[in-house]
Amino acid sequence: LESLYASRKYFTRFNEEEKILPKQLATAQNRAENMLELLLQNGATNIRTHCNVDPIIGLGNLEATLAALETYKNRVSSRIVAFPQHGLLRSNSVQLVKDAMRMGAHLVGGVDPATVDNDIEKSLHTIMDIAVEFNADVDIHLHDANNLGTFTMKRLASLTEEAGWQGRVTISHALGLGGVTDKEAEEVAERLANVNIDITSTVPIGKQVIPIPLLDKKGVKVSLGNDSITDHWSPFGTGDMLQKANRLAERFGWSDERSLGKALRFITGGKETLNNEGKRVWPNVGDEASFVLTNATCAAEAVARQTEKRLVVYKGNIVVGILNEVELNNLV
């Protein structure tokens, strides 16, 4: 019933987009650039964006996204997912996704092979076939609840192994893991870890939250991300990853200094400033100079208080903020 309710919500949004998308296309690049500016102001140095590919406006959004990212190429790194929002099979978008890959998208996307595409096997096989054809990574949005969701994850794991695509597949949301028994969640986590499938979560409020501590313990790479950022799907997104780390820590009761500090690695691609022995492990000479300076005494304070971001540096260049001489002397 939960998956049925969710799918009805999605189909309602799809119907809305049939009217909205053509009207918004003329301003797509401008809105994309505004979004990039927001993300940079919030400290982003690397972005993975899911770009709608659909039969309503074809590759119009992708064209606008590519143009916007070209404008910002010296300020942030980026990768684009060719995302068939209305269903790869449901909207007959297979050829569009292939065309998107040829145009410059980097990853093959998909959404809910069961409730949206209504054919788990065909949907997953098609996604993986496109990925292999274009030698591209995969990022699938999987909202399906409970055992339906975990069944889909296990099938994806098998296909990942068959294709030799270990380490190249991401499941966004993976909500099914939040509605199964601990035993089932452990088994799925172990299977995902075995084929190096990673998970991205928005740590949603009001839904069954996936067991991120369990996934982390089992060796599944977990990262945090934003879903909607003030669009017709939801008005609550901010684009602030530090806020996501804060929510993660609060949700799972990570309130001591060490746990709070470790929450930061879920938004830094796994980078930590200190190891378990308290030794500094980042930054080191030779590391890429892409980072954020924030007004905090330590990583734990930054997560707990969501401290002000003062400076964003990308590949050695300041892209947001100004560092004056007094502040520079205090850093040395």
Q: How would you name each of these model-derived features?
A:
Residues R79-S91, R102-I210, K221, T230:
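Active-site core of metal-dependent hydrolases
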Residues G43, V108, H141, I171, ...:
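Divalent metal-coordination and catalytic microenvironments
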Residues P283-V332:
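C-terminal cap of metal-dependent C-N hydrolases
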Residues L159-V169, P213-A296:
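His/Asp/Glu-enriched, well-ordered alpha-helical/loop segment
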Residues L1-H50, I56-T71, L96-R102, D129:
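Alpha-helical scaffold segments that flank or form the walls of functional sites
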Residues T65-A67, V97-K98, T126-M128, L156-L159, ...:
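Short, hinge-like loop/turn segments at secondary-structure boundaries
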Residues E37, K98, D129, A189-E190, ...:
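Alpha-helical segments flanking ligand/cofactor-binding loops in enzyme cores
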